[in-house]
């Protein structure tokens, strides 16, 4: 720093560092709204693993209901979680944390080359060709109902499974994003 004033600061730039490149795979995560720290953990890890957009989804089995002021506070909190995760992992761009929406709203607006809904009885994630953009739909505690899975399929989503075990709602995005980055991204 060369000079500090009441309203200004003058600095001299000694060295420019290249920012960490983002993954070539653009990922939009639709994450079922979950209780307490589970949602924080899912957002934190999804940010660290390169998600570009994260949308909390209100679905049939969702146990969390956010209204007005409380929803605004949670959204601000989740955005701070993403900022902290970016600082921790050295990521130079923040993911967009969208306000919570219903499943129907998200399904009608999700745009991606490959849209996947996680389901324990489906083809493996590895059976899909490389996309440039990817949307993942992950259910809340208790999962998505069969009607919701069918609704997602009708909206152009393909059912995919991550393996032989059913994962917790906060674990599924970690595994899904890790596998996607390994297959098609920058791992």
Predicted regions and their residues:
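Conserved hydrophobic positions within beta-strands
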Residues: 1-3
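RNA substrate-binding interface of SAM-dependent RNA methyltransferases
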Residues: 5-6, 10, 14-116
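Conserved residues at beta->alpha junctions
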Residues: 33, 140, 170-171
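Gly/Ser/Thr-rich beta-alpha loop segments that engage phosphate groups in nucleotides
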Residues: 38, 141-145, 165
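A short acidic, often aromatic-flanked loop/helix-cap motif at beta-alpha or helix-coil junctions
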Residues: 101-107, 123-125, 167
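Active-site/ligand-binding-proximal alpha/beta "capping" segment
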Residues: 110-149, 157-160
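Structured adenosyl-cofactor binding patch, chiefly the S-adenosyl-L-methionine
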Residues: 146-187
């Amino acid at each position: 720093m060369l000079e500090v004033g009441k309203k200004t600061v003058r600095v001299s730039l000694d060295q420019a560092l290249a920012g960490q490149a983002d993954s070539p795979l653009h990922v939009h995560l639709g994450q079922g709204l979950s209780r307490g720290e589970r949602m924080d953990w899912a957002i934190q890890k999804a940010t660290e693993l390169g998600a570009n957009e994260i949308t909390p989804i209100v679905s049939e089995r969702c146990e969390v209901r956010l209204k007005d002021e409380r929803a605004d506070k949670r959204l601000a909190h989740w955005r701070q979680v993403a900022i902290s995760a970016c600082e921790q992992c050295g990521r130079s761009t923040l993911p967009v944390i969208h306000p919570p929406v219903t499943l129907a709203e998200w399904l009608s607006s999700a745009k991606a080359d490959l849209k996947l809904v996680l389901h324990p009885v489906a083809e493996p994630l590895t059976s899909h060709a490389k996309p440039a953009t990817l949307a993942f739909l992950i259910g809340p505690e208790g999962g998505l109902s069969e009607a919701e899975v069918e609704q997602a399929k009708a909206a152009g989503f393909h059912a995919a499974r991550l393996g032989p075990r059913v994962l917790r709602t906060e674990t599924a995005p970690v595994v899904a994003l890790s596998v996607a980055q390994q297959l098609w991204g920058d791992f």
